[in-house]
Every structure is written in C-alpha cells, then in structure tokens.
Amino acid sequence: AGGLAQKGFKVGIVDADIYGPSMPTMFDLVGERPKMIEVDGVSKIEPILSQGVKVLSIGFFTDKENAVVWRGPMASKALLQMFNDAHWGELDYLFVDLPPGTGDIHLSLIQSIPLDGVVIVSTPQEVALADARRGVNMFKMDNVKVPIIGLIENMSWFTPA
C-alpha cells in the first residue's frame, strides 16, 4: 500500500483483522481516532491518512490492551461498517488486511464486497503455509471464485526450528 502511494496512486487499507488489528501500529497511529465528517448530509467515518495511505481499523475504536470478544455477526457488522460508513473518496486501490484463516470475516467480505483479487501472504512456517493453502482453496471455490493475483512469503530468511 505504501509503495503504491509513493508512486502517486490513491490508496486505502481496511484492517479487517477484527480480533488482532495491526494497522494502527504499522502506520504509527496508535491512540489515533478517526473523525466523523458530513458527506451529502450523512455522517461518515473519515479514514486517517498516514504515509499517503488512508487507514481504517477496528483498532482505532478499541483499547489495545483489551481483547475484542465478539461473535461472528458482530465482527462482520463492524467490518462492513468500515466499508459502508466510511468516506474513502476516490481510490485507485483499496487493500483489505484479513486475519489468517477462513472464518466469518472472510465470508462476510466475499459475500458483501466485490473483490478484484487477493494476494495471499504467509511466512515459511508449516502452520502458516497450511493456513495459506486453505485460503487459496477457499478463494478458488466455485461459489467464491476470487482471482489470486499474488503470493508473498514474508520473512523468507526465517528458518523454523
């Protein structure tokens, strides 16, 4: 996201890892809170601009020391609010950082938001690769069919014990 913003693209990112949001930390926004703005008579959440990227995370609305203990429907509703109740403006790219796995958040996103493609990110540990494989298989399912446009291996230098 940051690289595309540096190249002049208009970029946003939704931190969809409801139970473990990391974007406030990664974008040096811990403790920040988005403002509410009025757009065409409707109150909207304004994503926070950092490093040229518009960022919206559940981490902006929760205490980082406390666990987010929500059932699937509540987590899904919070996710969809970050799309539907936010004023993103014109974007070239909107990234969605999903949690590992293939749970309620993934299903809500697939069913509610049109996706142009996914990039699967993993680390070389076997347990992480197993999650990545399941993610690939989910996005390839007949009732899902979201194109996989990339696979990134983070920490490729790391040798698991």
Question: Residue locations for each model-derived region?
Answer:
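Conserved, well-folded catalytic cores of nucleic-acid-processing
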Residues: 7, 25-30, 59, 81-89, ...
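Conserved catalytic-core segment of NTP-binding enzymes
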Residues: 92-93, 99-161
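Phosphate-binding loop that captures ATP/GTP phosphates
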Residues: 4, 9-65
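Phosphate-binding/switch loop-helix module in NTP-utilizing enzymes
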Residues: 59-109
